[in-house]
Amino acid sequence: MEYNTVCGLEVHTELSTKTKIFCNCSTAFGGEPNSHVCEICAGMPGTLPVVNERVVEYAVRTGLATNCTITRYNKFDRKNYFYPDLPKAYQISQLYLPICQNGYVEITDQINGGTKKVRIKEIHMEEDAGKLVHDEWSDCTLVNYNRCGVPLLEIVSEPDIACADEAVEYVEKLRAILQFCGVSDCKMQEGSLRADVNVSVMPVGATEYGTRTEMKNINSFRAIHNAIESEAQRQIEVIEDGSAVTQETRRWDDAKGTSYAMRSKEDAQDYKYFPEPDLPPIELSDEYIDTIRQQLPELPEAKKARYKSEYGLTDYDTDMICSSVSYVRLFERTVEITGNPKDSAHWIMGEVMKLLNDSQTLPEDMRFNPDALGRIIQLQNGNKISRDSAKKVLAAVFTDNVDPDEYVKQNKMEMVSDTGAIRKVVEDVLAQNEKAVNEYKGGKAASFNFLIGQCMRALRGKAPAAEVTKILKEILG
């Protein structure tokens, strides 16, 4: 029997606000444990939360960018459960009236071809929990409350995703939208973007969904892909063995490529939601929403379309450049300097991405002057330096943020522009390679390429290849 996979994702993103959602504590990542904590986010009796207005703005911005309807009258609710990383024993979230509803993101339909819409059921604001630390002590678990109260958006999709590849593309597109809107850095390795993956399978032709399981807090694209494929296969094997899939929460172990049952899957009634009594409802005016709408940046899909029509870039080029807002900023500044969008794109997709990959650096963590790449391209295209030298200059810019012109001068990388000097070197090379010269004159075309290579080596790559070729042909006749 053949089966269809059905997936829905709950994507959690930490917002790039300076302070937490209900207090003034810092949201900075990586501080000393429990150094960004106050009475409010620690849940001390008698404290009262106050909503961070920037969180509301970012939620509306995200909703508009994902085609959602903004709920003019929305409110917070309490989600009640006990866990050591939740000091109040409840989480302030939104259940009944979330701030954004009924949106969508378009992705590639991997099953039927073309494109499809993954519907977004809702986007709601909530506070993050703390973090349990298990690996520093052998006899106890520690709790770091720095993350407690950091503002989150939870983006809940409908079960419209039919395979692992679609799930990854959906999260990639969400990440790009969030980054372009400036609401989150989406650094998955720091936990600022993570996904809860809901998976079920159903026989082809069936009309009812199968029993779903959930795998929580998956924080890489590879893990999302592998978790979905593994869980779908596990459920198929359970069904074909004559058993029933259990509705449960499972933990994905990416290192082992498998998941483990944690607990039975909870429903909303298990959390005993009720309206948050310490926070008033939020009422948003049409003017407020329209102001945010007008301030939206050019979003990834619109930017891709413009790059293709205005610059003649390919689908592949635009997908790569628009995969990170950092690439986009570098690309647009480089085009502004060089006036050459195709060279700018190829340098970013080639040398810049190679340097990032080799150094295991994220695009968001690039620290060199964005004007430098444009200047390097100008130097190479103006025959001031060779392609190989340009790569070396970029590597120095990447690691040490050097000035390209100063680096070229200090390392004597300037191209030889004196045709007389080039001719002298070519003549010397020909005198040293009489056999190759005679073979070329005897009709062996490959010897010409050999001689060019010898000339470029003698010139240490510091002469334009076209000029060397021209002089070589003139001498050989």
Which ranges hold each PLM region?
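Strongly charged, low-complexity linkers/loops
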Residues: E364-G374, Q378, K384-R457
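Basic, nucleic-acid-interacting segments
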Residues: M1-E298, D315, E336-N340, K354
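C-terminal non-catalytic interaction appendages of large macromolecular assemblies
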Residues: Y145-V150, M188-A195, V204-T207, E414-G477
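Residue-level detector of well-ordered alpha-helical segments, enriched
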Residues: D317, L330, N340-I348, A372, ...
